[in-house]
Amino acid sequence: MWFLILFLALSLGGIDAAPPVQSRIVGGFKCEKNSQPWHVAVYRYKEYICGGVLLDANWVLTAAHCYYEKNNVWLGKNNLYQDEPSAQHRLVSKSFLHPCYNMSLHRNRIQNPQDDYSYDLMLLRLSKPADITDVVKPIALPTEEPKLGSTCLASGWGSIIPVKFQYAKDLQCVNLKLLPNEDCDKAYVQKVTDVMLCAGVKGGGKDTCKGDSGGPLICDGVLQGLTSWGYNPCGEPKKPGVYTKLIKFTSWIKDTLAQNP
């Protein structure tokens, strides 16, 4: 939920209010076309709000703070504003927010010390299965803990200018390092818990930002996190981004999918 922590308006990815988090790619590069076929664009009506990942033909995983009653998704998009014949639109039939996510923070524009944005993940059941193609492919959940120091790739259409809210046209990628959670704990007064990951570049300049919430953090080729929250302006030195740690939630995800075939 890229709730930007200064101004973390849950604008991050579309949540009109989430405190300390914001998401967009800063200091990155244009992703190679169709190189992230699992990346999903999550909308509220016709408004882009967040990223997400395709888990299988029926399910998308995104951040809980991206929740709206009228979520829908586009799969296989590269350019956010162009019609692309290979892209697929799907309505969402049902949303499953993690039961421990604190919804009272969902639209709170004021962030407070010790606010806890843990459990920031949500499953979206598609109304019609996605067609799996060369440009629309699912990604597997992690089976092992990520290793500190791993090279991670984050992607999204979030703002590419730290102090200005302006979505990217083309899907952006950025390389980050997986850092100790202590680095994020020192950077923020909000809680950094064991269900979160800390990733960034110590000198700043590279980060996710507003609009990137819910998008993937892929470390050493494995999906390990979802963009959740961080500092505004994005990319500041000693202000890494915070991500939902997916290895902690694989059982909940698998159980939810199995119980809702």
UniProtKB/Swiss-Prot annotation:
It is an enzyme of class 3 (hydrolase). It comes from Mus musculus. This is Kallikrein 1-related peptidase b1. One of its GO terms (biological process) is proteolysis. It comes from the Eukaryota. Pfam families: Trypsin. Its EC number is 3.4.21.35. Glycans are attached at residue 102. Residues 19-24 form a propeptide.
